[in-house]
Swiss-Prot record:
A motif (DECH box) lies at residues 175-178. Residues 433-602 form the Helicase C-terminal domain. Residues 51-227 form the Helicase ATP-binding domain. It is linked to Pleuropulmonary blastoma: A rare pediatric intrathoracic neoplasm. The tumor arises from the lung, pleura, or both, and appears to be purely mesenchymal in phenotype. It lacks malignant epithelial elements, a feature that distinguishes it from the classic adult-type pulmonary blastoma. It arises during fetal lung development and is often part of an inherited cancer syndrome. The tumor contain both epithelial and mesenchymal cells. Early in tumorigenesis, cysts form in lung airspaces, and these cysts are lined with benign-appearing epithelium. Changing F960A: 2-fold decrease in activity. This is Endoribonuclease Dicer. ATP binds at L64, N65, T66, G67, S68, G69, K70, T71. It comes from Homo sapiens. GO terms for cellular component: cytoplasm; cytosol; extracellular exosome; nucleus; perinuclear region of cytoplasm; RISC complex; RISC-loading complex. Changing Y971A: 10-fold decrease in activity. One of its GO terms (molecular function) is RNA binding.
Amino acid sequence: MKSPALQPLSMAGLQLMTPASSPMGPFFGLPWQQEAIHDNIYTPRKYQVELLEAALDHNTIVCLNTGSGKTFIAVLLTKELSYQIRGDFSRNGKRTVFLVNSANQVAQQVSAVRTHSDLKVGEYSNLEVNASWTKERWNQEFTKHQVLIMTCYVALNVLKNGYLSLSDINLLVFDECHLAILDHPYREIMKLCENCPSCPRILGLTASILNGKCDPEELEEKIQKLEKILKSNAETATDLVVLDRYTSQPCEIVVDCGPFTDRSGLYERLLMELEEALNFINDCNISVHSKERDSTLISKQILSDCRAVLVVLGPWCADKVAGMMVRELQKYIKHEQEELHRKFLLFTDTFLRKIHALCEEHFSPASLDLKFVTPKVIKLLEILRKYKPYERQQFESVEWYNNRNQDNYVSWSDSEDDDEDEEIEEKEKPETNFPSPFTNILCGIIFVERRYTAVVLNRLIKEAGKQDPELAYISSNFITGHGIGKNQPRNKQMEAEFRKQEEVLRKFRAHETNLLIATSIVEEGVDIPKCNLVVRFDLPTEYRSYVQSKGRARAPISNYIMLADTDKIKSFEEDLKTYKAIEKILRNKCSKSVDTGETDIDPVMDDDDVFPPYVLRPDDGGPRVTINTAIGHINRYCARLPSDPFTHLAPKCRTRELPDGTFYSTLYLPINSPLRASIVGPPMSCVRLAERVVALICCEKLHKIGELDDHLMPVGKETVKYEEELDLHDEEETSVPGRPGSTKRRQCYPKAIPECLRDSYPRPDQPCYLYVIGMVLTTPLPDELNFRRRKLYPPEDTTRCFGILTAKPIPQIPHFPVYTRSGEVTISIELKKSGFMLSLQMLELITRLHQYIFSHILRLEKPALEFKPTDADSAYCVLPLNVVNDSSTLDIDFKFMEDIEKSEARIGIPSTKYTKETPFVFKLEDYQDAVIIPRYRNFDQPHRFYVADVYTDLTPLSKFPSPEYETFAEYYKTKYNLDLTNLNQPLLDVDHTSSRLNLLTPRHLNQKGKALPLSSAEKRKAKWESLQNKQILVPELCAIHPIPASLWRKAVCLPSILYRLHCLLTAEELRAQTASDAGVGVRSLPADFRYPNLDFGWKKSIDSKSFISISNSSSAENDNYCKHSTIVPENAAHQGANRTSSLENHDQMSVNCRTLLSESPGKLHVEVSADLTAINGLSYNQNLANGSYDLANRDFCQGNQLNYYKQEIPVQPTTSYSIQNLYSYENQPQPSDECTLLSNKYLDGNANKSTSDGSPVMAVMPGTTDTIQVLKGRMDSEQSPSIGYSSRTLGPNPGLILQALTLSNASDGFNLERLEMLGDSFLKHAITTYLFCTYPDAHEGRLSYMRSKKVSNCNLYRLGKKKGLPSRMVVSIFDPPVNWLPPGYVVNQDKSNTDKWEKDEMTKDCMLANGKLDEDYEEEDEEEESLMWRAPKEEADYEDDFLEYDQEHIRFIDNMLMGSGAFVKKISLSPFSTTDSAYEWKMPKKSSLGSMPFSSDFEDFDYSSWDAMCYLDPSKAVEEDDFVVGFWNPSEENCGVDTGKQSISYDLHTEQCIADKSIADCVEALLGCYLTSCGERAAQLFLCSLGLKVLPVIKRTDREKALCPTRENFNSQQKNLSVSCAAASVASSRSSVLKDSEYGCLKIPPRCMFDHPDADKTLNHLISGFENFEKKINYRFKNKAYLLQAFTHASYHYNTITDCYQRLEFLGDAILDYLITKHLYEDPRQHSPGVLTDLRSALVNNTIFASLAVKYDYHKYFKAVSPELFHVIDDFVQFQLEKNEMQGMDSELRRSEEDEEKEEDIEVPKAMGDIFESLAGAIYMDSGMSLETVWQVYYPMMRPLIEKFSANVPRSPVRELLEMEPETAKFSPAERTYDGKVRVTVEVVGKGKFKGVGRSYRIAKSAAARRALRSLKANQPQVPNS
């Protein structure tokens, strides 16, 4: 459209092109298609890029608005031409010369060139010095440097003296070249050029060609002159002409508004009053000293503002502004101290009130009266009416706009804010983010000159909208330059103002408001959408302001309207002519300008005649591209290619004229498009047609290669043509809620039973196998751990032991340890004899004894379980063995079994009566190896004791330890009414028989193999030597049990042994299955081979130093103990304690257990937040036991109030109430072989969530030793038969496989986390390499989409499930009484339900838990977050070592669990009530039992009776990161209520419940296990066998295929899992022959260079200078194209021979991740999983990579043409140089400490990190896929960092803050700042708010966190912002 610009139009004739009236219909160019994609021209590229093109093409003078683009163009041009200057100067190599005007500019240019290139730069700024140099001296300089930067005077001297001739210069750059017009050395230098035959390329840079008002003629002359002098063409940047020189120009209209006639005379009256007042103030000639403030200043300002508003907008607005000013004045008056000033302010105040009064006489201020506004305003409203959307009347009515009911719109009180619009705004509009296309079709800006004009005009428009339905659609806002300026000092008030402005811009960008009234600030630099209406309310006064405001009208159809008063219109016309002329001159200079007018084809003509459209399926009207739409398609396609925030990829089109006057175009797509060749179109009659036709041809090509889909739209990454990669699986149908693959979704699986133990019950007269369970004490318990000074009993000292009788052979498995009270016992399972038969009687006897062991000795029988060996899944028998008649051969001990059958004490208590006549006779030998039973109490389940010692010096008449009784005899008489017949028998010191049946891990170590804290040795010694702490029994009152103590001690180990055996066999079976499926390892092991022992990778010798006596609860060493550690005590009861694992991943811990490791073991430290006063009504001793025993430390709290900070609550040595049952809460209950202290993940990862010192806890178990052995490739020396075999060939050690199957929740001595991490990174590497090699044409976006699909948890979970892993996994703590099914037992369906409730002992246990589950927890009550509990009534249990450890832990967990209502059969989630100071636990069903009295004896408790937990709510279980029972997590208000209403009930003995994600983790861990044991090829084959393709398949013939049924469908989860496994093994044994040939090896993609006529020459040009880089990294590329590709950014279109670096970066990223992870994994320090994770994320991240890239000069070789990227890199490099040392962890390094207010973190250019990765990918490909080579190059670069971080693991600021302030830190959502960045505020409740700004949410968030941390650490709490 030609602008009907210059003739003033009357409004009547004004035909606006509004979107509604436009012929294209209202949908065209709607503003919310923010970055509208151009449809008729190619997407324009950045102007600096176009200027660079021009400069490369010919001599150019670049006219820029600012200095910013100048260096970019100069440096890039130098780099592009640098191949000419790398040569030797003596052999006519050339040099580049930069000329600057003054010495101080030299350094600036030097640093720019040095930063961005590796060229050698010489600087010459001092004429005096340089003038004296000789030719030789200069020659040295020229030889040494390639770029010479000199002041013009030095240069002139050098050239004139002929030291350097112009023909030696390839490029001459003139900075500030406009000086050449004057008489200046520049001119002289150019004169020298005139006679020079080979003149250098010339680049002139100027920013000041246009300053202020200037005459177009002069300007033109100036430019021409300059062009002539510099022999160049001037090119202007688009920021001097309308910004987007391609879009259709806005339609420019000048509107004459006519004169203002005011009939009422009010206008004149007000004007007169104001002028008088102003004159009066001006006349007050108060002498103003320069030092003092001018008293009249404020008054003058206010009155003149008021006058201006009156003149521009009229009386109605003047009244409004007077109202606002009165309010503002009140503030000044209030604060003004000085009398004179105050008088002036009061004068002004009165005067403004007078104005208001005058106005009120004429109109009511509440409604808008258009008689009292100026014609300009009226015209403006008319224009706005035309923009009213013409469909769907806004919401049927205008109510929503008119609900302001103030009678008086301007309130005169000072209580209101200076613009109450802000507040009203919120109320008056409902949510306006509806997407109706017509809501905000207007997107307009009105430019005004003064701030007040903007404020009042906005108010006026809102008022008009209320009264005129035509204007109701407008939602306006104003923005004034106030406070947006970059560098004013900010105070709080300005900050607030600034935020307000930003909010306004945000709403405008989001099109929540559709009209912005703005002062000139918005002309420049502010990021706002393309507008379709720009109104200049006040006329522009200079060219720049004209162009910039016009440049805001960038929507495809837009109007630029200038409102002029009649008197101004003449002079403005002149100005406008000038502006137009200047614009025209500059536009001609604008590179590549296409003057739209002439070339426009008449749109009516049917273009299809010119060139036929490309149509798909012509018959049924399929999609088509026509010559008119083709360009739009190409633009859209380019916009979808992957790129970074700095590069907007656009096509490049060159049009040339042929001699016959026709034109043809060549189209180049961005270099990461698969369509690489340029496309040449046919000759056409005009430029525009040529461009369109070539686009059409290109669309056709793109569609043919699959880049456009069948709707001719760009193919997204999802619509992959690589379907086979995404092997689309049917989503399994389950009723289980939750997203597949996530932690939230859990399902139940049967526990696997190893094939060799299934149906293994021996039958009479059938061959049997007899295995011996060998037990040898390998590491006796060291003295410092032997608290009771107990004698150690090595199991090998007694010959009688246990064996296993089974019908099937058991494969060889590694020996493994169990940990008894005597220390570490190594268990072996050795075949004794096979093929023998047994009679029925013998078998029955054996079976009875087997049942006796489990039901009576171990007391594992319960109503839910029934002994049915014939029905049981696994029913081998356990039986006693002994040596046969003094030989050393073991055999079945039938005699012993018969003796037991006969014994009276076998089950109950024998009823021997002693009398005076037949007194008791004491025989010492009977008591030497005995278990005794007190006969006088607990008749139903008598307690059993080992005899520890016989006190021959004590008798029943000795003194009783406690004062209540004189002697032992008196005690028994008084208490039990028992008389003794023998008063000189000795007394017995006894120990409880062990109730702790989980012996898988040592209990003095935590799960990491670190010692738990002990109390001091003296205290312990004193305690154990005092009789008070011993249990003393009288032999006469006890019966002797038929089972000797030595055998009993072995029996206690049976559950752990059988369980571990079971797990190892499951693992062995998986190893064998993988051997046949994947061809990795052998199916069955050689007979003479046994794997190295299973061990936890802990040091064998537990050296005494590791037991640290803790004397200060928060001492430094404390960090080594898990902050929330718990102790595994020796009775079953407390095994649960360790299950704190459930706390995994809780950022919010409700209990601060930091001080639980307290100095005196009998006390519990509870940290209570200081405001927890709810507790004080409670006196602690009231609930402690008052039994008959005494405690060594009975310091009860006397007060009834907790001291605020660390109060100790005594906890008595706990009776063992089986907390572990509760714990099955984890409900992945499985006979898991695990009993360790605390989930690793929890421990190290988040242990310090609730500690305030933020130091990570470094205590985690390293991978099992065999991992190390395998890595180091050495075998254990004791395994002599294994020499000659290795796990590389046989397959991984079952112990390692077991580790990979064990979750941290199982609390075993090992878990899968380290392996999982290694597997995770190898998986990423394997898949990445596969995709990279298989799809050489796919760009990075597609590759990473395919990768993310393959490695997603959801996919891995599916594959793991298909492989049958869930049944084999070990997911919960091994807890024999709760979730272990002894051999021969079955779960009795009928009884199991009742069993869970009607257990006699249960109520006692319940009593111990005064917990309460409160269904309706309303409040998130942060103060009372600390859990408090009363110490429940306790029983002392002298059997166990708790006193030595901290019962608190145990107690804390018990209470936590009990309080959690874990007994309820189905629990739906409900958070805990912490409002009560103690929990009361409401008993389900039997609440009346709550009052049952306790007997006060200390030995009357049964540990094994707790079955309550068979029904659990898995949604509550904690496996990875779900909620812990009883923990309320304030960050999730709904606390998972929605996720967890499902309750799954399942049987703990035979099933387990697993979260999908854990299965995915397990797959990764197995991969890690195969990788460490068998190497990379094996790991790849393993992946292929899972169904993850990472190797190419070699096609086999169909016949072979028929032989190999698909191995997909084996092992689904039926009960008969192993049956199908057997089938699988048969089926796959045939195929294993073909295995290795089935998968080939990956081939390197053949071409890395495109076919190109002179590719090699181009390559050499492009990589000139790279040899220096190769030297630096110490690697020479064989194929240099990889090197070029690695450094080519997508914006670098000069590289036509290779791809850009994105694909290599995709590859390199995975390679570095894997190499670094592998290096960390293999570190001899054996980092724990949490530390590994932290180290990995600290080392594998963009910041580190970018910093290293800069350190090793990658940036100097980087090839990109992107101005923004150039600046970011520039900043970053400068920053790195200043800092000069590497930064940890954080993706944004900080600039300066001072600039606190709005700290911007320096941005790390992602591109730098990318090329660091892409180079790794390039080396990998170039070296023939050798990881070693990559590591040789990269390890030296990374080593210092790896060392530094390993020594001191960095954490991300966000994580550190959350760990430091888990409850109180809250991050705000992102806000946009006015320049388009993101701001995040983090509020630390009570400590202040901290803001961070950055280009993305992540960057901003970490900036905010960093500032918060800095402030918290400096410990000066900021004043919280209101």
